[in-house]
């Protein structure tokens, strides 16, 4: 018994097993008919699970769905998290229906982001718990407190650093390639040794390769294979033999080459061996020695280690000279082929307008050629009959054989008052000594006058040939019809006088039509609303007309429609037209009863096929007179068919008139009206046949008992009440609208009333205004479309759009107000008033977005809740602790009820969730050298700001290679005016070229540096969707005990449905269900994805941008150019000579700030591959066939297990490629992809130098100079100097310094005093730096920065030092040349310190001494002996003489 009690106690003390995790807090419950499946998920801060607990009541079985959360990072609320798109904290939120979805958060706690350039570490600092993420080439994330460091190890890092609410993207590069360092860091070597090895890797590789080659040659020397090297050594041995025999002094004892430090040998150079030196000397002196044996020496060299060592060094140097380092190689990129997109939508609109454009062009073409032909004809006529044309202005006088101007001409018999005076201005003297003869020049001025007049008329015709004047005639008949009390036949649509008809009227909106009619005094201003309300389509306009129950209103609207479609009834003059389509189709689709029996009758053939219409009027009496006798039903049907066709042909007032005649049984008036229509449109055969048929039917006896269709009663006008029934009132108006006003800038309204007025023209009810204020002096305003809202602060006040009274009531115009005062108006209760309800406001909500917005004229902090409503909230960071994650208080402590703001009031929002701002590196250009010195000496190594000296900011990191170029321009006695230089520069970022500008005589004038600061092509991409791996599945399911599965399973947007029948069986059914092989399990599901990849689509075409800079010693300037537009300024003329075209992919993916390209699904495309599950605007979409199973429980509902919902092929995204040359710039919803490693073409540059008077330059110039320098040694920025030079003359001065100066020669002028120099110093200077300008030494003050940064920050689109270094130095030997010798000598420098000079002198002295002893002395002795021989020979010759 005791054992049993112990067991019971132990069992009671044991915890109840729970799946996924123990404990946890319930965050949401949702009783529902549908159950959720058990899901257990983990996010960055917690674990969450859902489960279903079934309960039964009187109405059935229900599921109490529960969500439970357990915190893993308990203090994450201390960082004050807030929701933001693209945040780096993934949190699973629970919806109201217990569906799970992933949201992203960031911390609101402040965080300082910096980069320690000396240790290459990202430094993050905060005061509380915070979360960081580094994405890009390095990916790291985590929680931290206080300060943390993240080490960078990629050669070039392209990063997006996010910490707290801040995000910064930047580009950073080391001063050396880091692949070697990363490799050695994985070994046992300490970090300092690894860095030293990698810094000296070039010399290490050279020595290692040399040793390997030497070992190989040493091994080969032991075999006969070594003789393969004889072709190499034979030429060397042969040359050495020549030098040996002819240039070296011989030893007196043995006859071999002089050897002061060794004994005489036993072997001769020819290979002979002698025991004594005397025999050797005899052999050499007697001429028996054949000389130096080159072949023997070559064989010895093949076996010797000395030549092998020298050969190994030479081979290693040659190999490394032509081998590119792996780190500086640019791998080839695969180019993706894209198919052409479909034509844009606007092409369809263009295609629809081609016909009208074609007709316009044809007309224009015809008129133009007509004018040309007329001009040619007039020209021919003028040439043939020009005397008749010219006779208009001048006459020929036969008496004096001259031409006289007709203006002011008077006749005196056969003579005139202008005789002896010709039109050419020449006179004939009285003596007759100067005889005048008429010539061509006499009438030239009149021909020119004719030509001028003709051209003026011709040009005037050309200018007005395309002009058109739209004139709308005044509606006199319409005005008359408005004055009639009832409808008349001549006041129906077909008979209205519309005046001139212009086709352009069809394009006018009804607003303009109303303005035209109001201007013609045809309508009142109170009629404008009913006209502007006409639908734009004809069918809608006709329905709108027939909905009006008053003749004057209907007539007004129909007149407006016919003013727009002024050819509507003129189309009836013929047998076709857009306005006849409806009634003709109606006739074709309906059959007359008589035509079924007599299909060959002329009338029936006319109606059906359009045949025999001309004879259809006479075959009624002859062939159909007996058909309708005693057949009233058929009579009624056929006549109603004809009348209905007439109704479809003539809608509006015509149909109303016909309905009136039918209701009055005025058959004669009806026939008279149809005959007037037939008379107006005699050319319409089918219309004429129908009207004749109606007239014929009227003559038959069945007309007395004819019953027309009921729809005609709907077309009858209703009695015109004094006030509309829906606006009726029980008493006279208490409002005095004669005193009404309409004030502006009113946002509140008291005693709101609806107002109705009668139009004095059409009698239409004008109900477009409301009244506010007191009855004695009401204020009237335009009626709001959305009603009015009761104010949340004062319940007697009403507002527009929402309860905050932010919108002004729209005042009516003065013309409208005057019409209201003159019209009959009354007030009624305004029905569209929205009173404040208790459920309209809220204290907290699940936040969708937050930020600061312009609300009307104010700047408010606003929260957008998950229900898409906007609320004022001054906190945006205060959690509602009574709710789950994501619920924020709208007021401090959730104490105040807040009401929604209308979205119309909200504009210019800085959303913090949907549009996060990403900062970039700040570049500060400092003009003053002292300010620059102060900025860089304050040790701002962790700042993300770059400081540039303005005058040298456009210089490259490395001194460029100079080339000589001749100055061009206009040569003068002083020099060259308008001087310029022309050159070509490759459009590649980081390219720099130095120009040594020479005069035409070859004199060096000055140095200029051209630098391509940036060269890239880019496109802007917009986000389509997010995707990622499936982390769980949302499921809702239900079951039926009996019966089939539902045909349509209810599900949410984006969810897939599943079902399985015959699920009920013994032991697998809920309590109370007794079924076997029956029932159904069904439900819906949706994947829960972890958003890891964002997909973007290209929105803009590629934009090529190149920034080219020119830097002189006293100025610098840049220009941005593109391949399309050349740049022409006072300083630059730049254009692309050749252009290379590239394209960026249409769809890209971004993961961890890294671009990926490849096969990616577009939005709405769910094919197999990357991106077939898409999250768009918070909803997840996809395709697939869900796979599910279920577990049976006795007398309980089944446990559904969904194993797969969507087809998610996210693993295919892992095979996407990451192009090395692409860079990414993120910016609030869009990204810009930049490719900066392509040569975009060749730039042709013309630099304008102005006037260079180099011939007046002085050779000797007095300069007063001072300077200031600052910078660092062996760093990225180097040394920057500012020289202040004062001189009275112009001169070209060379620049000399112990450091490498970028500009070797500058131009000094009296007008310019500030000059800037950039230089690279390998030795640390003292407190001053000596710079020689011309012959003047300048002791410039030097301020050095002690920091030695190993990493360089740069903007995204600019090149770094390491890339310029790789472009300049592409081989291993280049690296050895630049760094290797210095590295070898560095240990000795550290050892001897300041005595290094003495050490170097000692070493050089020893080397020189050895060269003198072993090289120079033998040569000198040989020369001395040769000279002595010549002296001895001379003496012997003198003795003989």
Swiss-Prot record:
Keyword Transmembrane (UniProt): yes
Signal peptide extent: 1-13
Start and end residues of each stretch annotated as Fusion peptide: 1066-1087
Transmembrane segments: 201-221, 306-326, 362-382, 451-471, 1396-1416
Disulphides: none
Effect annotated for changing residue 1066 to A: Complete loss of viral fusion and entry
Cytoplasmic topological segments: 222-305, 383-450, 1417-1433
Role played: Glycoprotein C and glycoprotein N interact with each other and are present at the surface of the virion. They are able to attach the virion to a cell receptor and to promote fusion of membranes after endocytosis of the virion.
Family to which this protein belongs: Belongs to the orthobunyaviruses M polyprotein family.
Name of the featured protein: Envelopment polyprotein
Originating gene: GP
């Amino acid at each position: 018994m005791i054992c049993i009690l112990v067991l019971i106690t132990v069992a009671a003390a044991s915890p109840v097993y729970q799946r996924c995790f123990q404990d946890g807090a319930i965050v949401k419950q949702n009783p529902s008919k549908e159950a959720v499946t058990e899901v257990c998920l983990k996010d960055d801060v917690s674990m969450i699970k859902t489960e279903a607990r079934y309960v039964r009541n009187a109405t059935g079985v229900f599921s109490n769905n529960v969500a439970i959360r357990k915190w893993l990072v308990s203090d994450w609320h201390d960082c004050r998290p807030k929701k933001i798109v693209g945040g780096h904290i993934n949190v699973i939120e629970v919806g109201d229906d217990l569906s799970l979805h992933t949201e992203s958060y960031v911390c609101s706690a402040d965080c300082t982001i910096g980069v320690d350039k000396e240790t290459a570490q990202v430094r993050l600092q905060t005061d509380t718990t915070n979360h960081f993420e580094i994405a890009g080439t390095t990916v790291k994330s985590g929680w931290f407190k206080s300060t943390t460091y993240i080490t960078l190890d990629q050669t070039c890092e392209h990063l997006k650093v996010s910490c707290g609410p801040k995000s910064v993207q930047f580009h950073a590069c080391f001063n050396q390639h880091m692949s070697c360092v990363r490799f050695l860091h994985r070994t046992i070597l300490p970090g300092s040794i690894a860095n030293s090895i990698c810094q000296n890797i070039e010399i290490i590789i050279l020595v290692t390769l040399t040793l390997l080659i030497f070992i190989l040659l040493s091994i080969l020397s032991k075999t006969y294979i070594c003789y393969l090297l004889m072709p190499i050594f034979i030429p060397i041995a042969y040359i050495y033999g020549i030098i040996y025999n002819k240039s070296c002094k011989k030893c007196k004892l043995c006859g071999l080459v002089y050897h002061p430090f060794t004994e005489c040998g036993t072997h001769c150079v020819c290979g002979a061996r002698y025991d004594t030196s005397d025999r050797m000397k005899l052999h050499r002196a007697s001429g028996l020695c054949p000389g130096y044996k080159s072949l023997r020496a070559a064989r010895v060299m093949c076996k010797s280690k000395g030549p092998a060592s020298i050969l190994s060094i030479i081979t290693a140097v040659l190999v490394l000279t032509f081998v590119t380092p792996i780190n500086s190689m640019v791998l080839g990129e695969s180019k993706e082929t894209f198919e052409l997109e479909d034509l844009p939508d606007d092409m369809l609109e263009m295609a629809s307008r081609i016909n009208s454009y074609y007709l316009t062009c044809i007309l224009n073409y015809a008129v133009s050629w007509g004018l040309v032909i007329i001009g040619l004809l007039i020209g021919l006529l003028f040439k043939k009959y020009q005397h008749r044309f010219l006779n208009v202005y001048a006459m020929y006088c036969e008496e004096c054989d001259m031409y006289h101007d007709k203006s002011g001409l008077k006749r005196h018999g056969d003579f005139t008052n202008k005789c002896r005076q010709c039109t050419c201005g020449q006179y004939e003297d009285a003596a007759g000594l100067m005889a005048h003869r008429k010539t061509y020049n006499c009438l030239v001025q009149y021909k020119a006058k004719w030509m001028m007049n003709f051209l003026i008329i011709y040009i005037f015709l050309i200018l007005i040939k395309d002009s058109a004047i739209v004139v709308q005639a005044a509606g006199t008949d319409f005005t008359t019809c408005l004055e009639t009390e009832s409808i008349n036949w001549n006041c129906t649509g077909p008979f209205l006088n519309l005046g001139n008809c212009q086709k352009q009227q069809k394009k006018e909106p009804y607003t303009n039509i109303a303005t035209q009619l109001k201007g013609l005094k045809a309508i009142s201003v109170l009629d404008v609303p009913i006209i502007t309300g006409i639908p734009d389509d004809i069918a809608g306009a006709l329905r709108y007309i027939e909905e009006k129950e008053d003749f004057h209103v209907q007539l007004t609207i129909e007149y407006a429609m016919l003013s727009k479609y002024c050819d509507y009834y003129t189309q009836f003059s013929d047998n076709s037209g857009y306005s006849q389509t409806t009634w003709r189709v109606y006739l074709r689709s309906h059959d007359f009863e008589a035509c079924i029996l007599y299909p060959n009758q002329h009338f029936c053939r006319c109606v059906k096929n359009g045949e025999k219409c001309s004879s259809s009027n006479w075959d009624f009496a002859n062939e159909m007179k007996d058909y309708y006798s005693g057949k009233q039903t058929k009579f009624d049907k056929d006549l109603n068919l004809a009348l209905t066709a007439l109704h479809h042909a003539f809608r509006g007032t015509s149909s109303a008139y016909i309905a009136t005649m039918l209701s009055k049984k005025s058959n004669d008036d009806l026939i008279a009206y149809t005959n007037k229509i037939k008379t107006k449109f005699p050319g319409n055969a089918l219309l004429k046949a129908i009207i004749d048929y109606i007239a014929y039917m009227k003559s038959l006896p069945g007309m007395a008992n004819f019953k027309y269709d009921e729809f005609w009663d709907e077309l009858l006008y209703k009695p015109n009440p004094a006030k509309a029934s829906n606006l009726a009132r029980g008493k006279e108006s208490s409002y005095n609208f004669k005193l009404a006003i309409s004030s502006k800038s009113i946002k509140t309204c008291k005693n709101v009333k609806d107002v109705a007025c009668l139009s004095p023209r059409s009698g239409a009810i004008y109900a477009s205004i409301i009244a506010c204020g007191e009855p004695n002096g009401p204020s009237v305003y335009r009626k709001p479309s959305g009603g009015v809202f009761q104010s949340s602060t004062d319940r007697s006040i009403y507002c527009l759009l929402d309860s905050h009274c932010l919108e002004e009531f729209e005042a009516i115009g003065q013309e409208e107000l005057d019409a209201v005062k003159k019209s009959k108006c009354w007030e009624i209760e305004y029905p569209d008033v929205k009173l404040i309800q208790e459920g309209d406001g809220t204290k907290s909500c699940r936040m969708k977005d937050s930020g600061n917005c312009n609300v009307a004229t104010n700047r408010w902090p606003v929260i957008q809740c998950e229900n898409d409503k906007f609320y004022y909230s001054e906190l945006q960071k205060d959690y509602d602790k009574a709710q789950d994650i994501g619920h924020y208080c709208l007021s401090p402590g959730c104490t105040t009820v807040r009401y929604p703001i209308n979205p119309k009031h909200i504009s210019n929002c800085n959303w913090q969730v949907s549009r996060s701002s990403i900062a970039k590196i700040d570049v500060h250009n400092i003009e003053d050298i002292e300010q620059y010195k102060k900025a860089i000496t304050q040790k701002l190594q962790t700042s993300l700001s770059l400081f540039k000296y303005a005058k040298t900011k456009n210089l490259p990191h490395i001194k460029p290679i100079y080339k000589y170029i001749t100055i061009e321009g206009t040569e003068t006695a002083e020099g060259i005016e308008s001087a310029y230089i022309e050159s070509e520069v490759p459009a590649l970022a980081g390219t720099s070229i130095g120009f040594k500008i020479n005069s035409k005589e070859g004199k060096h004038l000055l140095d200029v540096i051209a630098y391509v600061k940036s060269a890239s092509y880019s496109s802007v991409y917009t986000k389509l969707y997010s995707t990622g791996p499936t982390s769980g599945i949302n499921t809702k399911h239900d079951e039926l005990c009996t019966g089939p599965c539902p045909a349509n399973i209810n599900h949410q947007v984006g969810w897939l449905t599943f079902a399985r029948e015959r699920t009920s069986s013994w032991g697998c059914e809920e309590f109370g269900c007794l079924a076997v092989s029956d029932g159904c399990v069904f439900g819906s599901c949706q994947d829960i994805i972890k958003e890891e990849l964002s997909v973007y689509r290209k929105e803009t075409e590629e934009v090529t941008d190149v920034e080219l800079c020119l830097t002189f010693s006293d100025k610098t300037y840049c220009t941005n150019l593109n391949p399309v537009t050349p740049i022409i300024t006072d300083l630059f003329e730049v254009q692309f000579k050749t252009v290379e075209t590239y394209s960026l992919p249409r769809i890209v993916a971004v993961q961890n700030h890294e671009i990926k390209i490849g096969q990616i699904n577009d939005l709405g495309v769910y094919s197999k591959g990357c991106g077939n599950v898409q999250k768009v605007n918070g909803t997840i979409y996809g395709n697939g066939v869900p796979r599910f199973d279920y577990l049976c429980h006795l007398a309980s509902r089944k446990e559904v297990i969904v194993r797969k919902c969507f087809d998610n092929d996210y693993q295919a995204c892992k095979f996407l490629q990451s192009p090395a040359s692409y860079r990414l710039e993120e910016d609030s919803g869009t990204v810009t992809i930049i490719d900066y490693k392509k040569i975009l073409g060749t730039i042709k540059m013309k630099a304008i130098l102005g006037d260079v008077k180099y011939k007046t330059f002085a050779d000797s110039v007095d300069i007063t100079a001072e300077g200031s320098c600052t910078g660092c040694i062996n760093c990225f920025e180097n040394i920057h100097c500012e020289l202040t030079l004062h001189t009275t003359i112009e001169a070209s001065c060379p620049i000399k310094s112990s450091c490498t100066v970028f500009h070797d020669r500058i131009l000094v002028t009296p007008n310019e005093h500030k000059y800037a120099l950039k230089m690279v110093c390998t030795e640390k200077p003292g407190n001053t730096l000596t710079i020689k300008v011309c012959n003047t030494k300048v002791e410039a003050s030097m301020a050095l920065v002690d920091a030695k940064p190993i990493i360089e920050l740069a903007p995204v689109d600019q090149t770094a030092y390491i890339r310029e270094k790789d472009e300049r130095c592409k081989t291993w030997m280049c690296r050895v040349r630049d760094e290797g010798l210095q590295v070898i000598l560095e240990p000795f420098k550290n050892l001897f310190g300041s005595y290094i000079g003495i050490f170097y002198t000692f070493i050089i002295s020893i080397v020189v001494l050895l060269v003198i002893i072993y090289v120079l002395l033998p040569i000198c002795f040989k020369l001395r002996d040769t000279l002595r021989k010549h002296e001895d020979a001379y003496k012997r010759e003198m003795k003989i003489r």
